[in-house]
Regions:
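Core nucleotide-handling region used for phosphoryl-transfer chemistry
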Residues: 2-218, 234-241, 269-630
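Long, acidic low-complexity intrinsically disordered regions
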Residues: 245-266
């Protein structure tokens, strides 16, 4: 692999640049309240730095990511600064003794869906700029350029990144957002010991609920007020001269005793507070260490891969050669075969499937290394890698886009079993015999896009109508009315009062029935609207590919729509049990789509544990990114 030592921006410069961005954003938070696009607020644009210790003396590892997860796609699409300076995985080393930063690892840029409309004249937007912008720039400024594209199969696993740093002789192993630095297997234990992280604990864990806390504060306040009241009473009695000298002495002793008790109580409270703080800190540290869950698993996998695929298959000299060649670069792949975290596609063995290599020192000027270079390295060191299909070379960018549009149609019609989510495209060009990757994008299958669409719609299904809540509210109103009438008509005879009571009960029941019926009708209407929206949005997808088999086979398309409708209605029946929806989702998918999807018991148990018994609308929020899962 070619070594490129010139840096386009130093780690120190990058850190200062990102900090400066945060300062400007914080100013805009104070100054502006009008930022309403995508419900986005200035605080969503803040960059988050997670600074953690490492087993190496005086060395910290800083994971850098966008603070907002909800609006990540919109921010990366709209904000040039974020798109240029943040990757899907980015970490720096900080050497405390040298007061300097170094690159630790670098992921691929954030990339988006390719659209056929990019080829249309006059189509200019941020999405096109993100996917094709750099290669369009090449076509305008360079001559004698050859254009081509690599299609790689999208691996269905967990994002895995590994880099080797020669300065500190360590591996940086990471999920998308959380990294660790280790030199050997023993260093893994460092990340399991709470004591190593005590000074980094920010106190973000809570032990008491607010109600418990408020209750204790009130009790303490009442006790103090009672003491103060007694003391004031004694002082008042003295002023009026009603106490004899003996009583005064007793009261003075009582005052002194109260003061001593208060001091002792304060001391005990302080000790209790410290004990609680220790418990809270311990709990908080345990929570904090959970963020390393994926990275520690990945470290075990990586050390095993090194042992089995490189050291055992050759000799110890090869590992040194591998480190030398990998230095200042990050391998990008997906961890697969974990039965506890299977996705739609099932992999027989635990492994890491690689698909890209990024130069850590080329944040601004390179997306990643040419795929031909990367795949040569994977082959040389016996690492698993994804399938790759290079296109022919074209003389113009327009010809390249025509070819990609043809591939768009082919991939669109493929099944989940054939292509899973779809393909990632690496837009490449050759200038003076040298290859560059100038853009990345995604081509997705209709099946995958449809399933995502159904999932999105399931999230918007309103909860079932709560009849008991309606009953409670209506009865409450009638009882209030009843009390008012009783005050005015105390002199009425009992028989008339009983008749009025019966009449009121009838009114209550009728109102409950009517309101429940109205709300159920309103909910049914909303569910039908969701189903219709699912169909209309799917038609919009199909309009992109007029010759698609789904457009030409109406019965096939009806099966898909029936399936989507079935899932949305299933979700509507029982909002609390997402597991059943998910299981049905897979079973119907197997039957309708003829997809050979394996479901193992471990997977089912994991899903059941995760989703069973949930009762709120949060069930259908995006999974993800607590740091441990990223």
């Amino acid at each position: 692999m070619e070594s490129q030592n010139n840096i386009d921006i130093t780690a120190n410069e990058l850190y200062e640049k990102l900090e400066s961005w945060n300062k400007d954003i914080k100013k805009s938070i104070d100054e502006s309240k009008k930022h309403k696009k995508y419900s986005l607020k200035p605080k969503d644009l803040l960059i988050k730095f997670n600074r953690m210790p490492t087993p190496i003396k005086d060395l910290e590892l800083i994971d850098i990511k966008l603070g907002s997860k909800i609006y990540e796609d919109e921010i990366f699409l709209e904000k040039d600064f974020i798109a240029e300076n943040l990757r899907r995985g980015e970490s720096l080393f900080y050497n405390k003794s040298e007061d300097s930063y170094d690159y630790a690892r670098l992921g691929l840029p954030k990339f988006f869906d390719y659209q056929k409309s990019f080829l249309e004249i006059g189509t200019e937007n941020k999405l096109k700029e993100r996917v094709l912008g750099k290669i369009i720039e090449v076509s305008k400024n360079e001559k004698n350029v050859k254009y081509f594209v690599y299609l790689t199969t999208k691996v269905n696993g967990e994002n895995f990144q590994v880099s080797y740093n020669s300065k500190y002789d360590c591996w940086v192993i990471a999920s998308k957002n959380v990294s660790i630095a280790i030199r050997n297997k023993e260093d893994i234990e460092f990340y399991k010991n709470e004591k190593n992280f005590e000074e980094y604990y920010q106190g973000d864990s809570r032990i008491e609920t607010m109600s418990e806390k408020e209750k204790k504060i009130k009790e303490k306040k009442d006790k103090k007020m009672e003491k103060k009241k007694k003391k004031l009473e004694r002082i008042e009695r003295r002023k009026k001269g009603k106490n004899e000298e003996n009583d005064n002495q007793n009261e003075n002793e009582e005052d002194e005793k109260d003061d001593n008790n208060e001091n002792n109580e304060n001391k005990i409270n302080e000790e209790e507070k410290n004990d609680k703080m220790d418990i809270k800190k311990s709990k908080g540290l345990k929570e904090m260490l959970k963020r390393f869950t994926f990275s520690l698993e990945f470290a075990e996998i990586w050390l095993k891969i090194l042992q089995e695929k490189i050291i055992n298959n050759s000799n110890s000299d090869l590992i040194n050669e591998f480190k030398k060649e990998l230095g200042d670069h990050t391998l990008i792949g997906e961890s697969v075969g974990d039965k506890k975290r299977e996705h739609i596609l099932v992999y027989k063995e635990r492994d890491v499937i690689f698909y890209g290599i990024v130069n850590n020192k080329k944040l601004l000027s390179e997306n990643c290394l040419p795929l031909s270079n990367g795949f040569d390295l994977f082959k040389k060191y016996n690492l698993s890698y994804t399938e790759i299909s290079p296109s022919q070379k074209f003389d113009s960018l327009e010809d390249l886009c025509i070819y990609i549009n043809e591939q768009f149609d082919v991939i669109f019609d493929k099944s989940l079993q054939e292509s899973g989510e779809g393909n990632v495209i690496y837009l490449s060009c050759e200038i003076d015999g040298k290859e560059y990757v100038k853009g990345l994008g995604k081509l997705k299958t209709f099946e995958y896009r449809f399933l995502r669409k159904v999932r999105e719609k399931c999230k918007t299904v309103p909860p079932p109508v709560d009849r008991s809540k309606i009953e409670f509210e209506i009865k409450k109103k009638f009882n209030e009315l009843k009390k008012k009438k009783e005050k005015k008509k105390k002199d009425k005879d009992n028989e008339k009062a009983e008749d009025e009571e019966k009449e009121m009960i009838e009114k209550i029941n009728k109102k409950i029935e009517n309101e429940t019926k109205e709300k159920n009708q309103e909910r049914d209407k909303r569910i039908n609207n969701i189903i219709n929206k699912m169909k209309s949005e799917s038609k919009t997808l199909l309009n992109e590919v007029p010759k698609s088999k789904f457009n030409n086979d109406k019965d096939l398309l009806k099966e898909y729509y029936d399936f989507g409708e079935y899932l949305i209605n299933y979700r509507a029946k029982d909002l609390t049990n997402y597991f059943d929806v998910f299981a049905s989702f897979i079973e119907v998918m197997k039957e309708k789509f003829k997809a050979k999807v394996e479901i193992n018991d471990l997977l089912i148990n994991e899903i059941r544990k995760k989703f069973e018994g949930l009762i709120s609308d949060n069930d259908f929020k995006e999974e993800g990114d607590e740091d441990a899962k990223e």
